[in-house]
Regions:
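Short aromatic/hydrophobic "clamp" motif used to bind/position activated sugar donors
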Residues: 78
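A conserved acidic beta->alpha catalytic loop
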Residues: 21, 37-45, 85
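Conserved donor nucleotide-binding strand/loop of the catalytic core
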Residues: 31, 45-72
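Short, well-formed alpha-helical segments that are part of the catalytic scaffolds
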Residues: 11-25
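Catalytic metal- and UDP-sugar-binding loop of GT-A-like glycosyltransferases, i.e.
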Residues: 58, 81-83
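Cell-envelope/extracellular polymer assembly enzymes that use nucleotide-activated donors
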Residues: 1-3, 32
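Donor nucleotide-sugar binding loop of glycosyltransferases
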Residues: 11-14, 40, 62
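Acidic donor-binding/catalytic loop of UDP-sugar-dependent glycosyltransferases
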Residues: 43, 83-97
Length: 98
């Protein structure tokens, strides 16, 4: 399984497109999605609530957020994405195969 870790802060405008795209893999149980919020003041977490497996809240800092997400990840492959990074299903599955 792939664990996709997405550190965010105030990404309400970007997050839904990315998360909606990842739902096919999530439905196949090929990935888990971990959103790590670094203090958003917009509705980022509300938008993501039903589209991710975990929402964690922590202090701001990409490295801190990534490490917190990695600490609960269940996958044997970790993929770190930005909220506005779009990766195809084929690309993700090729990472899993390597």
């Amino acid at each position: 399984m792939i664990s996709i870790i997405i550190p965010v802060r105030n990404e309400a405008q970007n997050i839904s497109k990315n998360l909606n795209h990842l739902q096919e893999l999530r439905r196949r149980n090929s990935c888990e999605i971990i959103l790590v919020d670094g203090g958003s003041t917009d509705n980022t977490t509300e938008i993501a609530n039903n589209l991710v497996d975990h929402i964690l809240k922590t202090k701001l800092g990409r490295a801190v957020q990534q490490n917190i997400g990695a600490s609960i990840a269940k996958g044997n492959t970790l993929v770190f994405l930005h909220a506005d990074t779009y990766i195809t299903t084929k690309q993700l599955l090729s990472i899993k195969e390597d």
